[in-house]
């Protein structure tokens, strides 16, 4: 199985980017992982929230194939403990999915078209984080999930 994380806009903070790169490298020992950044939409100030979501949605959907399984990182998604999340990763791997695609949307969430294509929504927390920080937190949780599956000493109960 491959895992792809799609996010809108580049990571501006160099310190965050360094940590994202570190966990991406660590994750590559367990699974093929791609972080795909969609460029910020130009002239966003001239768009309504709905128009911005629709434009971002078109770009997101252009990055997936019909066989990809799409899961959204969404504030209204289901929350998991790290162990339960690792169990979900194992189930997805066992199911024969070729590519599992997680998406971090823009500031206003996702378009209706993106929601229609999703296989689920997960939330990292009831708290709100910047979208740039969510990238780091989520990639770290992927890494943690695989260390749990391999019984490696990264995660402590």
Swiss-Prot record:
Specifically methylates the pseudouridine at position 1915 (m3Psi1915) in 23S rRNA. Belongs to the RNA methyltransferase RlmH family. Keywords: Cytoplasm, Methyltransferase, rRNA processing, S-adenosyl-L-methionine, Transferase. It is found in: Cytoplasm. Pfam families: SPOUT_MTase. The lineage of its organism: Bacteria, Pseudomonadati, Bacteroidota, Flavobacteriia, Flavobacteriales. GO terms for cellular component: cytoplasm. HAMAP family: 23SrRNA_methyltr_H. The gene is rlmH. It catalyses: pseudouridine(1915) in 23S rRNA + S-adenosyl-L-methionine = N(3)-methylpseudouridine(1915) in 23S rRNA + S-adenosyl-L-homocysteine + H(+). Its main location: cytoplasm. This is Ribosomal RNA large subunit methyltransferase H. GO terms for molecular function: rRNA (pseudouridine-N3-)-methyltransferase activity. Homodimer. S-adenosyl-L-methionine binds at residues 73, 105, 124-129.
